[in-house]
Regions:
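Nucleotidyl polymerases of mobile genetic elements and RNA viruses
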Residues: 1-231
């Protein structure tokens, strides 16, 4: 990807009236039209394969799935938990990954794409789209000097949501491994029914586990491991 096609303007949109600090603004990336065409072509090629690549526990951005499905499952699990009897209950943890797109390390994204065994030329093109960008912040109608990011993927980039959910599958794998090693006790909606340890909602996730110190430590260690891997 030629660098001049990957120049990006960032404009700050206030999240609420009277925004007076940086965290109260949402950065929106204004990308080159040619760049958007290239990334949309990549997305169009990737989308048909996502149902096979992405776990059923992620329902956002995957063709044939609806985010409402996970909301219904979550409500049913919580309802079941309120009816359970026993000395030890279960817990639900909702996690909002702050600045999730901004913190992904580029080497981690490449490792995930290679893990999915995408064709090397496609991986090279995707990583060129991700890593060759230069950014200017649109401020009071002016465009200051450009700078080059060293990590993260851009908000409002057509490719970004799909890269993100592919990266989140690594967290799902870490959770499944904990469950298989009996280090994480998931929740069952019914006796003999499917066990649920987590559900994904794009960049949010809901975790289910037994409410004891052992599981709390396991949840924390799993999240720490993912943060260390992904940045």
């Amino acid at each position: 990807m030629p660098s001049h096609l990957n120049e990006t303007l960032i404009t700050l949109i206030p999240k609420h009236p009277g925004a007076d600090c940086l965290v109260a603004f949402r950065p929106i990336s204004l990308c080159n039209t040619v760049y958007k065409v290239v990334t949309k072509i990549i997305v169009k090629r990737l989308r048909p394969f996502l149902p096979k690549l992405i776990s059923p526990l992620q329902t956002t951005f995957v063709p044939g799935r609806m985010g409402l499905d996970n909301m219904i499952i979550t409500q049913e699990i919580i309802h079941t938990m309120t009816l359970k009897k026993g000395k030890t209950g279960f817990m639900v943890i909702k996690i909002d990954l702050e600045k999730a797109y901004d913190r992904l390390e580029w080497h981690f994204i490449r490792d995930v794409l290679e893990l999915y065994r995408l064709p090397p030329p496609l991986i090279k093109l995707i990583m060129s789209c991700v890593s060759s960008s230069s950014i200017s912040v649109l401020l009071n109608g002016g465009k200051p000097e450009r700078f080059h990011p060293s990590r993260g993927i851009r908000q409002r980039d057509p490719l970004s949501p799909y890269l993100f959910i592919m990266c989140m599958e690594v967290l799902g794998f870490l959770i499944f491994r904990r469950c298989e090693e009996n280090l994480w006790d998931p929740v069952r909606a019914s006796r003999g029914g499917q066990a649920f340890s987590h559900l994904f909602f794009a960049d949010d996730l809901v975790l289910f586990a037994k409410a004891d110190l052992w599981n709390c430590n396991s949840v924390r260690e799993t999240l720490d491991s993912f943060c260390e891997l992904s940045g």
